[in-house]
Amino acid sequence: MTPLRKTNPLMKLINHSLVDLPAPSNISMWWNLGSLLGTCLILQIVTGLFLAMHYTPDASMAFSSVAHITRDVNYGWVIRYLHANGASMFFICLFLHIGRGLYYGSFLYLETWNIGIILLLATMATAFMGYVLPWGQMSFWGATVITNLLSAVPYIGTDLVQWVWGGYSVDNATLTRFFTFHFILPFIITALVALHLLFLHETGSNNPLGISSQPDKITFHPYYTTKDILGLFLLLLTLMSLVLFSPDLLGDPDNYIQANPLSTPPHIKPEWYFLFAYAILRSVPNKLGGVLALLLSILILMTIPMLHTAKQQSMMFRPLSQLTYWLWAANLLTLTWIGGQPVSYPFITIGQVTSVLYFITILILMPTASLIENKMLKWT
C-alpha cells in the first residue's frame, strides 16, 4: 500500500520538501543553517504572538506594559528574552548562511540568491521596528536617528520623514504603525521563505565541491533530518544559555530608561547586528552619501553573481579567493566593533578604512583573485 505522504496532495508537498527530497550526499554542517533559520522564524512568531497578547502599543503605556510582561505574566520574562535573544540567533544564522553562500558559490542560483537578499532586508526592517517597541531611550533615539535618514532624499525628504513618523516627531503614531508592521512582516517573511525554497528545489542544493550533485544523491530523511537535529540542539543550547544566564548581554542598558524626548543618550547605537552597516553610514561625512553607502552595503550582494569571474563555483580549491574572502569576513567583524564605539579618534579613521576595504574586497579583490587563479590553472 502506498504511504499517505505519497498520495495526499498536502502531504505530497511536505514529502517532496522534507522527506523524499533528493539531497547531495556530501553537504556539510554549513547546510544546516537553512533549517535553523526556519526554527528561529517559528520561535519568533510564537513568542511574538504571546508578547502581543500583553503588550500595549501606546506611547504612555508601552514601557510599563513590557515591565508588566517581565514581572507579572507567567513566564513572561522567558518569552520576552527568548524573543529578544532569538532575534540575535536569527541574525547569527542569517550572516553565516550568507557567508556559506558566498564561499561555496550558491549565489549562482540567481532567483534563490535574490529572494534571499530581499529576505535579509525584510528581516532587518522587522528587527528595527521591533527594537522601537519597548519604548526605552535607545528605542526612541534609535528610531529618531534611523528614520531621519530619509530626510537625505532630495526634494521630498522632509515630507517623507513626517509621513513615516505620522507627525513632527517620533511619537504615539510612529509606535502604533511600527507595531502593526512588526506584527505583519514575519508572515510576509514566511511567504518569501516558501518562494526561496521553491526556487531552491528547482535547481537542487549546491555542495562543498561546487560540482554537479546529480550522480550521487540521497533522501533528505533520515540522513539530513538527523544531522539537522545536532545543529538545532547547539542553537537551543546557545539561546537558552543566553536567556537563562545573561539575557541582557546583547542589549543596551539605556533601554531600561523610559523614552524621554528631552534627554539624548551619550551614544546612540542600534542592535549589534546592524553595527556593521551603522559604521559604514557614519564613515561618510555627507548625509546622502552615508545613506547610499548604507543601502549599498546590503545591495552589493546582488552584484556578486555578476562579479563571479572564476571557472569554479566553490572557493574550496581556490586559495587566493579564500584569502580575499576571510579578509572580507575579518573586515566585517571590525566594522561591527567600530559601529559600537564612540565617534572619536582613532575609531573614525578605522571606520573609514574598513568601509572602503569592504567595498574594494567585493568589487575588486575577489574578482581579481579569481582571474589570477584561472590564469594559474591555464583556464583562461
Curated annotation (Swiss-Prot):
The UniProt entry lists membrane topology as: Multi-pass membrane protein
In terms of domain of life, where is this protein from? Answer: Eukaryota
Give me the comment on cofactor binding: Binds 2 heme b groups non-covalently.
Keyword annotations from UniProtKB, A to Z: Electron transport, Heme, Iron, Membrane, Metal-binding, Mitochondrion, Mitochondrion inner membrane, Respiratory chain, Transmembrane, Transmembrane helix, Transport, Ubiquinone
Membrane-crossing ranges are 33-53, 77-98, 113-133, 178-198, 226-246, 288-308, 320-340, 347-367
List cofactor names only: heme b
Binding of heme b b566, residues: 97, 196
CDD domains from the UniProt entry? cytochrome_b_C (cd00290), Cytochrome_b_N (cd00284)
The UniProt annotation places a ubiquinone binding at: 201
Q: Which GO terms describe its molecular function?
A: metal ion binding; ubiquinol-cytochrome-c reductase activity
A biological-process GO annotation: mitochondrial electron transport, ubiquinol to cytochrome c
Q: Name one GO cellular component term.
A: mitochondrial inner membrane
Q: Which InterPro entries match?
A: Cyt_b/b6_C, Cyt_b/b6_C_sf, Cyt_b/b6_N, Cytb/b6-like_sf, Cytochrome_b, Cytochrome_b_C_euk/bac, Cytochrome_b_N_euk/bac, Di-haem_cyt_TM
- Which positions in this protein are listed as binding heme b b562? 83, 182
Q: Where in the cell is it found?
A: Mitochondrion inner membrane
* Subunit (UniProt): The cytochrome bc1 complex contains 11 subunits: 3 respiratory subunits (MT-CYB, CYC1 and UQCRFS1), 2 core proteins (UQCRC1 and UQCRC2) and 6 low-molecular weight proteins (UQCRH/QCR6, UQCRB/QCR7, UQCRQ/QCR8, UQCR10/QCR9, UQCR11/QCR10 and a cleavage product of UQCRFS1). This cytochrome bc1 complex then forms a dimer.
- What is this protein's function? Component of the ubiquinol-cytochrome c reductase complex (complex III or cytochrome b-c1 complex) that is part of the mitochondrial respiratory chain. The b-c1 complex mediates electron transfer from ubiquinol to cytochrome c. Contributes to the generation of a proton gradient across the mitochondrial membrane that is then used for ATP synthesis.
Q: Which family does it belong to?
A: Belongs to the cytochrome b family.
Any other noteworthy remark? Heme 1 (or BL or b562) is low-potential and absorbs at about 562 nm, and heme 2 (or BH or b566) is high-potential and absorbs at about 566 nm.
Q: Which PANTHER family match?
A: CYTOCHROME B (PTHR19271:SF16)
The protein's name = Cytochrome b
Q: Which organism is it from?
A: Nomascus gabriellae
